Amino acid sequence: MAAGGVDVSRSSVAVKKDYDFYRNGSRDVYVRQSGRDDERRQIKRPSDHDLRRNDGRHRSRLAYEKGELREEAEVQRPSEKRRKFSPIVWNAEKVGRAPSREKTKSPFPVPTTTVISNQAVAGKTTSNDQVNALMSPEPSYLAPVQPSEALLAVKHPVDDLEEGQLEEEQVMQEDVKEGLLEEEQVMQEPNIKTSRWGTGLTSPKEELISVNVSKTNRWNRSSLTPECEEVMVSEEQQCYSSGSGSGHLSVEKLSADGNSGREYYSSDHDELEHEDQDSLTPGEMNMMFGSRSVNEFQKLNKINEGTYGIVYKARDEKTKEIVALKKIKMKEDRFEEEYGFPLTSLREINILLSCNHPAIVNVKEVVVGGKNDNDVYMVMEHLEHDLRGVMDRRKEPFSTSEVKCLMMQLLDGLKYLHTNWIIHRDLKPSNLLMNNCGELKICDFGMARQYGSPIKPYTQMVITQWYRPPELLLGAKEYSTAVDMWSVGCIMAELLSQKPLFPGKSELDQLQKIFAVLGTPNEAIWPGFSSFPNAKAKFPTQPYNMLRKKFPAISFVGGQILSERGFDLLNSLLTLDPEKRLTVEDALNHGWFHEVPLPKSKDFMPTYPPKR
């Protein structure tokens, strides 16, 4: 006691009684907590016979299955201390089988009863047994003893049952059978044949790739891991813009100026179809379950019809919004017989539904045809123009500030794709859509795919020939984002000059036109050049870069001019060696976009009357 303090007793005057049921289910033992210690008292309880009759149907199945009921070779205990078990199931995860119901006579002189579970017989104690040992101390002679096999083999005759106990045993047998049946129904092994997905309607995995997935699931991340599975993208579908682009691999009509590229051979398409075809399984093809019907849209007019699809301008009857309906044509080949849906179209749908960026076309959903229509439609936002059509309608090239505005939007959208490990593999003016608000959006992900690290071999039959980089023309199969940057350089040159930079008529002619402007490469300029399959061809020797002559800094006869910084950007994008080619991040941070004239605001970009 502190000096000068008052000695105050710590004992409680009023005794607080708290009676709690034990968690082991005993109903006859209570705890009374008072000032300093806990007293355990035995509360008077009704006769065993009454409890057996009243509580026979309320015994816990789990307690029985765990062996915590009276069973063979059990140590007897006075009847007045026999415990009843709570019907509350404390641990439903542990499921066991009911032991045998035969009884044996105890070899011990003391007629006591102690709970012996299956785990106790095996030499283990359950958590409830430990709680019982701590909460209710018993004499040492009441400790559970493991019976021998000889004792377990002894059977107790039915005549030895007490009065009323036979009825109790019958009730218990019925309860246990019902309990085991219910437990078997609940705890049965998972079987896909008996699940609700065994019917082929839908599955959890298919629900995740449902075409009605919310836009909140779209990628809004800065990067993805390179080891993630290939994003399923498509080659078959063209952008819904008019087929005015030209060149090899184009799925659109030839341009009005008569420039033509090589036809898109079916063998090239087959090679693209077979590229990583094992990445899709038949279970991932059932993605149209629960989609809306195309009858909920009113078709206004046809925008374009190509080899692989028809595009309509339509109105959503529910929201009254003008959209573009892109009809996916089904082809009869092995993939559709196996999966029921074109592989490349499935890839395109999945990647477009996963992307969320203002410079990438927005695919709202995928709808199915009517009762007699098995076609599938992509519902996309409607934009009035494509860059190829706008360039054909203009009588003069874009100004430098307008080119900067368009290039920044293109690079911004491409940065989003490359950050998410996606290569577009078909960038060209006809795959860039525009609206009357000055916005540019990338579309047509038919050849796009997700790449990883290390780089895997891909098909080189991608990208329209006029915008295809030299490494693909030379037969390279290991490539990454540098192929898109070459296409961006070709688009920039076309925006400045109003005409394609390398309009080759064949792959060989395309290479010759590239080398005629940029110079013929060698091992010093391009390490590894001679190792390409098509590098053995003899090309005219031209050691000089003639690109500056096409885009002079000063012009005395009119036409477009390009500053030093602008030429540096264009020349860096059109570097022959893909390892030295400019990346999208470096292109966005280039000084050309920060010098006068500055990029024009999208609000002040020229508008054009809609043609569709």
Swiss-Prot record:
Expressed in leaves and inflorescences. Lower levels of expression in roots and stems. One of its GO terms (cellular component) is nucleus. It is an enzyme of class 2 (transferase). The keyword Kinase applies. The modification Phosphoserine is found at residue 453. Keywords: ATP-binding, Kinase, Meiosis, mRNA processing, mRNA splicing, Nucleotide-binding, Nucleus, Phosphoprotein, Serine/threonine-protein kinase, Spliceosome, Transferase. Residues 26-60, 239-278 are annotated as: Disordered. It catalyses: L-seryl-[protein] + ATP = O-phospho-L-seryl-[protein] + ADP + H(+); L-threonyl-[protein] + ATP = O-phospho-L-threonyl-[protein] + ADP + H(+). Residues 26-54 have a biased composition (Basic and acidic residues). The active site is at residue 426. The modification Phosphothreonine is found at residue 459. Pfam families: Pkinase. It comes from the Eukaryota. Signal peptide: none annotated. InterPro entries: CDK, CDK11/PITSLRE_STKc, Kinase-like_dom_sf, Prot_kinase_dom, Ser/Thr_kinase_AS. Cyclin-dependent kinase involved in pre-mRNA splicing. Required for the correct splicing of the sixth intron of CALS5 pre-mRNA. May stabilize the binding of U1 snRNP to this rare type of intron with a GC 5'SS. Involved in chromosome pairing and is required for the completion of synapsis in male meiocytes at high ambient temperatures. PANTHER family: CELL DIVISION PROTEIN KINASE (PTHR24056), CYCLIN-DEPENDENT KINASE G1 (PTHR24056:SF415). This is Cyclin-dependent kinase G1.
